[in-house]
UniProtKB/Swiss-Prot annotation:
The gene is rdfA. Disruption phenotype: The deletion mutant forms only disks across all growth phases and is non-motile. Keywords: Cell shape. It comes from Haloferax volcanii (strain ATCC 29605 / DSM 3757 / JCM 8879 / NBRC 14742 / NCIMB 2012 / VKM B-1768 / DS2). Involved in cell-shape determination. Required for the formation of rods and wild-type-like motility. This is Rod-determining factor A.
């Protein structure tokens, strides 16, 4: 079931994040595209996780286009993985950011605009009042919401760290050249010594202790 009407934002008329980035990057029809993909109008239904990736790759392509950069096939997808993947090294992420900057992209704005699973969920279910009869994603809401919370806090910690360092540099209390801040989160089981990213743990649902018990 869909509601094609636009919602009234509770945040000073700014609207939900999906609408804000659609306006910023000129992504015409983004909201309706999400509704159609979620409901499966004329095609297979997309999950909330898939829609999260779809939107982020689309906005990365738009950011590159806006900067006048030629976008190769698969390039937006690769930048998305490098900017957000839990298994990406700090060096690789820094290289990706530097490459985007060299091509004229405002990386800080782009990273702030990257959406989460929760943004898609809120937009579809709260702002567009969309429901579908066979909603398998409800079974994974707890896991996805948990991952979204971790990612949001990780991004927030990175932003706060940059703000603190910048402030101390301006006050000449800290001296550093061009820098990047990376927040690397790992969950370690002290019983089996498995070390995993939050995404790997929550996606698999277990550490190696489960495998050892099966053996």
């Amino acid at each position: 079931m869909r509601d094609s009407g636009r919602s009234v934002s509770r945040r000073g008329g700014r609207g939900p994040k999906i609408e804000r980035i659609a306006n910023r990057y000129g992504l015409d029809g983004l909201g309706d595209d999400l509704v159609d993909a979620w409901l499966g109008d004329g095609r297979a239904q997309r999950s909330l996780r898939e829609l999260e990736g779809d939107v982020n790759k689309r906005l990365i392509r738009a950011a590159l286009d806006e900067a006048g950069a030629h976008v190769l096939d698969g390039e937006a997808e690769n930048f998305y993985r490098l900017l957000t993947g839990d298994d990406v090294t700090a060096g690789s992420r820094t290289d990706a950011r530097n490459t985007l900057r060299e091509r004229g992209v405002d990386v800080e704005q782009l990273e702030a605009d990257i959406i989460s699973y929760q943004s898609v969920y809120n937009y579809l279910k709260r702002h567009r009042n969309v429901e579908r009869e066979d909603d398998d994603d409800d079974e994974t809401d707890a896991t996805e919401a948990g991952l979204a919370t971790i990612r949001k806090l990780r991004s927030r910690l990175r932003t706060v760290t940059i703000d603190v360092v910048d402030r101390l540099v301006k006050a000449e209390r800290v001296f550093i050249g061009a820098y990047e801040v990376e927040v690397d989160i790992r969950v370690t089981c002290t019983d089996c010594d498995t070390r995993m990213t939050p995404t790997a743990l929550l996606s698999s649902g277990h550490c190696d202790c489960e495998r050892e018990r099966d053996e």
